Regions:
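Conserved alpha-helical positions within TPR/SEL1-like repeat arrays
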Residues: 27-38, 64-79, 106-121, 148-163, ...
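Bacterial N-terminal signal peptides
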Residues: 6-16
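Short coil/turn linkers that connect adjacent helices within long alpha-helical scaffolds
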Residues: 58-61, 99-103, 137, 141-145, ...
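Terminal, low-structured helical/coil segments at or just beyond the last alpha-helical repeat
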Residues: 356-398
Length: 398
């Protein structure tokens, strides 16, 4: 903290020498923090914001720039998952906002919800409940009992109760939220689908699959109507519905749902994406449960092949990085692992690529004989691929 103070004071002194105000310095530091945050340099953004916060202390107690600085440093901490560091800033921000707007102003709700989330992440459920409950009370008084934002606050509390294993209270609050959303936004609104899924997830986590199933089915119908039957955002709902069907041993109903997820992912991300491997595993699991092992095996094999290809790419990239950093032993170990995978895959193109890269590393290490053996294998692979390639048709002469 002393470093941040010193940095800001130095900036102020420099600014004074240049005829600039403390306000201009604060704006410059905040801009530097914003750029660092947008570039993903969170530690630098944090450093700049600590400096800006020290500078903002010199403004009037209710100067909005102090609250703005607190909001930004909270955002940086949350992005990094540093919830414990965000907590005291939330309390201070809330105190400033209450002093400015009063204790029942709607503008307090985002800060209360953020504070509730910080407590919930630390499993401080009573403190989280207090923050969420206060946000709910403010919304009910300002907006009425039937406003969609009230439903959001009810859902926050329901999720908290679910995490605290207070399942009856959670179900009650989800039910209230669902009733509000259906009446205020219509029974086919996407927010209704979200609430249905949240309630279904509560039942699923308790093993109450029969109660979860109709909620997931209704949520799926709403989303299909809004997005069409092949949208990739349908997959979580399809998978959840398939899972509760599987949990009830309704395997013939789970199978087509997992098939749909597989087809959607193949179209959305390509047949060799790791996500497709997960979809294949899910479908294969249904066949195993039905003892249809001849159907499960090719799916598991395909999933394994996808993961091997993905691992091969990762090994190659990391090995190339190590080679560029002259960490040759580490690079060689990775190329050996990549080579073992490529040999197993029986994919000549991938095998040739790994052999060539490994040979290049061996040349760098002045191990020419070993490199030559690998290069000879690469030539053999290329020759076989060329022989298998169909001859090009000659273009007719005009």
């Amino acid at each position: 903290m002393r470093t941040a103070v010193a940095a800001f004071l130095l900036a102020v002194l420099s600014a004074v020498a240049l005829g600039q105000s403390q306000s201009v310095v604060w704006e410059g530091v905040m801009e530097a923090a914003r750029k660092a945050y947008e570039q993903g340099r969170y530690e630098e953004a944090e450093k700049q914001l600590k400096s800006a916060l020290q500078g903002a202390e010199g403004f009037e107690p209710r100067d909005p720039r102090l609250a703005t600085t607190l909001e930004q440093i909270i955002t940086v901490y949350r992005t990094q998952g540093k919830m414990a560091l965000a907590e005291p800033h939330y309390h201070r921000l809330l105190g400033i906002q209450e002093g400015t707007w009063g204790p029942l102003d709607l503008r307090l709700v985002p800060t209360l919800n953020g504070l509730g989330m910080v407590y919930a992440s630390a499993r401080q459920y009573e403190e989280a409940e207090s923050a969420y409950q206060r946000a709910l009370t403010i919304r009910e008084k300002a907006l009425g009992d039937a406003h969609p934002d009230v439903a959001t606050s009810l859902e926050n509390l329901a999720g908290l109760y679910g995490s605290a294993a207070k399942f009856e209270q959670a179900a009650l609050f989800y039910g209230r939220a669902l009733d509000i959303r259906e009446k205020s936004q219509g029974p086919e609104h996407l927010n209704v689908a979200t609430t249905l899924e949240s309630m279904a997830g509560l039942y699923r986590d308790q093993g109450k699959y029969a109660l979860a199933e109709p909620l997931y089915r209704r949520a799926l119908a709403i989303r299909e109507k809004a997005w069409g039957p092949e949208h990739s955002d349908l997959v979580p709902t399809l998978d959840s519905l398939a899972w509760v069907c599987y949990g009830q041993r309704k395997f013939p109903e789970a199978e087509p749902l997992y098939w749909r997820s597989l087809v959607i992912w193949e179209k959305a991300v390509g047949a060799d994406h790791p996500t497709v491997a997960t979809a294949l595993d899910n479908l294969a699991g249904v066949y195993v449960a039905e003892e249809l092992f001849d159907k499960a095996e090719p799916l598991y094999r395909r999933a394994l092949s996808i993961r091997e290809k993905s691992a091969l790419v990762s090994f190659d990239k990391l090995a190339s990085l190590y080679a560029g950093e002259k960490k040759y032993p580490e690079a060689e170990q990775l190329y050996k692992q990549a080579l073992a995978i490529a040999e197993k895959m029986n994919e000549p193109v991938e095998l040739g690529m790994v052999l060539q890269k490994y040979a290049e590393l061996l040349r760098l290490l002045e191990r020419g004989e070993e490199a030559a053996r690998l290069e000879a294998r690469v030539k053999d692979i290329h020759a076989k691929l060329a022989a298998e390639r169909p001859p090009e048709k000659k273009k007719p002469k005009h």
